[in-house]
Amino acid sequence: MKAVIFVKQSQRLPGKHLMTICGEPMLSRIYRTLEHTGLFETVVVYSKYPDLALDGCLIERDPTTGTLIDSILDSIVKFGEFLAVGGDLPLLNSEVVSEFVLEYDGRPLAAVNSEGTIEPLFAIYNRRIYGELLESSKHSKQIFTFVKERFHLIQINEERSRSLFNVNTLEDLEKARTIADCSHTASR
């Protein structure tokens, strides 16, 4: 299985994926966390940024111009089975990733955070779901309903849900910086 980090240009917080948390770009932090699990044959950043470059990160360009569904459909064709991860989850930790991936039994799988929100960018997609997702995308570009109806859903408890905190505003970024565990990066 691969891990695919989805990155598109943010309207609310432009350049957020390269903003630093614990002295490193948010995107590098997520990438490193996924690599650290040892669960993935490859970690890939799937980016709509035309000129994104980060040392140590494998970056593939997302050629789609539509919604998240379009990017996921394209990713299924390119990567097959993968854990989809949002590029704005700087608090993601390897324990949560490992526990989630170990729940995977071949059925598409998505996390539901402690507030009841389905996380389409903390989910496992595979070719089994491609046809249904493609057909659904012809009628609706809303991925939440599709995931709710077609995926095996795993409830993430409140403590673990904190690692799924996403950054969309400067206030979110400051909050993430405040609660991030920077002890592992102190020597950098």
Predicted feature locations:
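A short, N-terminal amphipathic alpha-helix
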Residues: 26-40
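Short, polar loop motifs at secondary-structure junctions
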Residues: 45-52
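Active-site acidic Asp-centered loop
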Residues: 47, 85-87, 168
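Short phosphate-binding loop-to-helix
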Residues: 53-85, 91-99
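Conserved donor-nucleotide/metal-binding helix-loop-beta segment in metal-dependent transferases, i.e.
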Residues: 93-117
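Conserved nucleotide-sugar donor-binding
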Residues: 118-132, 170
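Conserved alpha/beta core of the MobA/IspD/sugar-nucleotide pyrophosphorylase nucleotidyltransferase superfamily
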Residues: 139-188
